[in-house]
A protein has these predicted regions:
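Catalytic strand-loop segment that frames the active site of acyl-thioester-processing enzymes
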Residues: 17-55
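Conserved positions in beta-strands of structured domains
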Residues: 23-26, 96, 111-113, 153
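Small-residue-enriched segments and motifs
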Residues: 20-23, 88, 108-110, 150
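HotDog/MaoC-like acyl-thioester-processing domains
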Residues: 102-107, 111-169
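Short aromatic-glycine motifs in intrinsically disordered, low-complexity regions
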Residues: 6-16, 139-140
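Hydrophobic beta-strand-centered segment that forms part of the acyl-chain substrate-binding groove
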Residues: 3, 69-109
Length: 169
């Protein structure tokens, strides 16, 4: 097992630079992961016309990175390289807020619900909740406030050839 906390998280995800959104992994096991993400003023997902808050639906990418980090630590623990993964869709998506203000520190939790190793597909029940509210918003967004939850359907191609076939290359 990787010692926790794991910080930075870029080696767990097939992302780089500002696209890596998770600050650290606090804990993980065979079926779950708990990470932290801060909505920073330079967050790549912030819309130019509303730079003070992340649209709630963008939280799906943060939850997907929680799933990706889980897959990353599982791969590293097994001596395998980190693989590319895809968010296929969501179910039971529930928004606690329409937007997540800059400065919000969030708990990101992903719990494995179903895994098909033969086809490299899985379902994870995920949540984003306020860990630390942004300054001045403590009454509006107290710690523990559920921001977003849902079941994420994911797929990871087993190899480069399979990915090329999917992409029609």
């Amino acid at each position: 097992m990787q010692p926790c906390p794991i910080k930075p998280t870029d080696h767990l995800l097939p992302h780089s630079g500002r696209m890596v959104l998770l600050d650290e992994v606090l804990s993980y096991d065979d079926t779950s992961l708990h990470a932290v993400c801060t909505v920073r003023p330079d967050c790549i997902l912030l819309p130019p016309d509303s730079p003070d808050a992340l649209p709630g639906w963008q939280g799906m990418e943060i939850m997907a990175q929680g799933v990706g980090a889980w897959a990353g630590v599982q791969a590293l623990d097994a001596g395998r390289p980190v693989q590319l993964g895809f968010l296929l869709g969501t179910r039971k998506l529930e928004f606690g807020v329409p937007a997540i203000p800059v400065g919000t520190v969030m708990d990101v939790k992903a719990v494995l619900s179903w895994l098909d190793n033969a086809n490299n597909m899985g379902v994870f029940d995920c949540t984003l909740a306020v860990r630390t509210p942004p300054a001045g918003r403590e009454a509006e967004l107290p710690a523990g406030t559920l921001l977003l939850s849902g079941a994420l359907n994911v797929f990871s191609p087993p190899n480069r050839e399979a990915l090329d076939a999917i992409l029609g290359r």
